[in-house]
Amino acid sequence: MAKQIKRKRRPQIKINTFCRFTAAGVTKIDYKDIDILLKNIDESGKITPSRMTGTSAKFQRKLTTAIKRARFLALIPYTDKHKK
């Protein structure tokens, strides 16, 4: 029988350890506040996960619904600007 090779997992790096919305005392995330929404979207247009931003689960859910509403209303783009 062949020997099995044990693979070690790469440790995940957490960038922020606190929620910016909780620290600022925010109670509501509005889809019209584009500056906050764009800070939580990466270069390719994807929503940044909470393990990277440190956002709590409650505000991550509110943030994703606000981003999806803003995309639907064409306030923010679905993808990045494709440069030629």
Swiss-Prot record:
GO terms under biological process: translation
Signal sequence segment: none
InterPro entries: Ribosomal_bS18, Ribosomal_bS18_sf
GO MF annotation: an example: structural constituent of ribosome
Transmembrane segments: none
Record keywords: Ribonucleoprotein, Ribosomal protein, RNA-binding, rRNA-binding
Superkingdom, taxonomy of origin: Bacteria
GO terms for cellular component: cytosolic small ribosomal subunit
Database matches in Pfam families: Ribosomal_S18 (PF01084)
PANTHER family referenced in this protein's UniProt entry, alphabetically: 30S RIBOSOMAL PROTEIN S18, SMALL RIBOSOMAL SUBUNIT PROTEIN BS18M
Assembly and interaction partners: Part of the 30S ribosomal subunit. Forms a tight heterodimer with protein bS6.
Function recorded in the entry: Binds as a heterodimer with protein bS6 to the central domain of the 16S rRNA, where it helps stabilize the platform of the 30S subunit.
Family of this protein: Belongs to the bacterial ribosomal protein bS18 family.
Protein name: Small ribosomal subunit protein bS18
The species this protein was found in: Vesicomyosocius okutanii subsp. Calyptogena okutanii (strain HA)
